[in-house]
Amino acid sequence: MKDIVSKVIRGFHFLRCYGVKDFFVRLREKGEEQGITYDEWKKLHSLTEKQLQEQKKAAESWVNKPFFRVVIEKELEEEISPATLKSLENQTYDQWSIEENEQAAMILFLKNGDVLAEHALYTIACLSDEKDLIYYDDDKITDVNNEPVPFFKPDYNLDLLRTENYFGTSFVVKCEFIEKAGLQEKLCNITGKNRIYEEIQNRIQKAAEREIQLYELILCCIEHTERIGHISDILVHHMENKNMDPIYWDYYLQRQCELVEQHLQRMGEKAKVTVENQLQACSVQYYVTEHERVSIIIPNKDEIEVLQKCLDGIKKTNYDNCEIIIVENNSCKDTFSFYHRIAPEEEMVHGVQTFQGKLSHNIDIKVVVWENEFNYSKLNNFGVQFATGKYYIFLNNDVEMIGTDWILRLSGDCHRNKVGVAGVKLYYPDDTVQHAGIVIGIGGSKRGIAANMFQGLPREEHGYQNRASLQAENGRR
């Protein structure tokens, strides 16, 4: 019964926000949604023998054939896995060697035991002229039934990469780029002797350090190039350690935070990096040293109690330089009485009726009257005309605040170079996710080109690959 009530509440919320037409489109989409198993997916995406042979013929005709040096992570005394070698020998593209080679144009990293898809090197080689760093999807055997679990990765996402190494332990980097960027030492840390690695006595920590060195190389690479490619195809199969020791994660996450902090310092970013043990990831909180003025714009029609809860939440913020602009739209007289109480100074500004006052000692409040019919975009744009802040927060009147640092978090992100918009995770009243980011092209939505992620997910759950709980760039598939 509780689940039904929650769905009804979310349905009414969707209807209120998007209107009748989109509500029924969403209802139809929900009825059509269905998933497929990984086995079914593989059947749909597997190459035929004919296609594999065509790749071999095509590669033979290439004038420029990039050569791969394959670096296999293993213990010194450990033999190379026959499965890994066989997968290399079965490639439709045969320009590779596990030995150091002066002709190598690309370096491919593998863990001992990894199995490459037959078309892996060919697919990567096709992209090699355009990209300096290439990663791809993979799967891992992680459960008791030895069933592989796929990891479908997003396109290059800087914020997500700073929380976890979603590129993984198998990726490709161009040799020429390594030299130009001056990263030979970082590469030698992986392929040769490494002081930190040699000093570690614990076997499990050594394994973690090997993977950390790969992550460090990735972070250093992205500081020097934006030519980063993602191949949306599963090109490598990993044999995962099913009983990963806690010692591994304690060491790995500590080192990861250190590397991310160093990376952020090199990039001139101000942030606090902490460990998220539950997510086995890092949390990066960007901050500003100066609290520049923030204007919070809230369209409103009646709903005094709802608006009051929203204002009470804003009042608790620990940000000390902000203003609230309520854009009034055709409310009744009782609502105007409420406006007079919270903003008693009434005046006409450029022909617009306004009310001004103080919500608290550090928060100014202003009500501006929009007398035309409801249009959400026009209401917000109208409110901006009266804003004095450097940053704008566009807020619905039914939003209640959970914490006190949300403006600090948003302004910290917006202050960064190349960031124009920042958003927050929203919950419905029943503690399910309203949205945890927006993605372009998801599900082929009939309502537009983008959709909310993880709608309806219980608050205590983290979603696919923890994406509902990790900071990431919106719009990335």
Predicted segments with their positions:
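Short aromatic/hydrophobic "clamp" motif used to bind/position activated sugar donors
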Residues: 107, 392
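Short, acidic, metal-binding catalytic loop of nucleotide-sugar glycosyltransferases
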Residues: 59-65, 85-95, 312-321
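A short, conserved alpha-helix in the catalytic core of glycosyltransferases
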Residues: 177, 188-233, 260, 406-411, ...
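A recurrent flexible, glycine/aromatic-enriched loop bordering the glycosyltransferase active site
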Residues: 148-177, 377-378, 441-477
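Glycine-rich, basic loop-to-helix element that forms the pyrophosphate-binding segment
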Residues: 101-103, 370-387
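Conserved donor NDP-sugar-binding/catalytic core segment of glycosyltransferases
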Residues: 118-149, 176, 226-227, 399-446
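A conserved acidic beta->alpha catalytic loop
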Residues: 76-78, 113, 328-338, 372, ...
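Non-catalytic membrane-proximal stalk/linker segments that position and tether the catalytic domains
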Residues: 2-68, 73, 79, 84, ...
